[in-house]
């Protein structure tokens, strides 16, 4: 009977240990997924910022081009 109790205790102990290991791995996996989602959100924000910056540079380039054309026409065709 004592042998049976020890065996049962050992089985329960090993079951609890394996269960706690599985829960720990699950938590680690959830944390990794959360970090990946945060990284994706950051990259989406960075992409939006870059697009906005490129749009501003594009419009600035258009303005500078128009000014350069106006200056060139002024010097080439003085009135």
Curated annotation (Swiss-Prot):
Segments for region (Disordered): 27-46
GO biological process terms, semicolon-separated: defense response to bacterium
Main location: secreted
UniProt xrefs under InterPro entries: Frog_antimicrobial_propeptide (IPR004275), FSAP (IPR016322)
Signal peptide from the UniProt entry: 1-22
Biased composition (Acidic residues): 30-44
GO cellular component, one term: extracellular region
Prodomain positions: 23-49
Known function: Has antibacterial activity.
Name the record gives this protein: Raniseptin-9
Species lineage: Eukaryota, Metazoa, Chordata, Craniata, Vertebrata
């Amino acid at each position: 009977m004592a042998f049976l109790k020890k065996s049962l205790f050992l089985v329960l102990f090993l079951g609890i240990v394996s269960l706690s290991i599985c829960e720990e791995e699950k938590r680690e996996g959830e944390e990794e997924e959360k970090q990946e989602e945060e990284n994706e959100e950051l990259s989406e924000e960075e992409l939006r910022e870059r697009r906005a910056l490129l749009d501003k540079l594009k419009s600035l380039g258009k303005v500078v081009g128009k000014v350069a054309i106006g200056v060139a026409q002024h010097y080439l065709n003085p009135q």
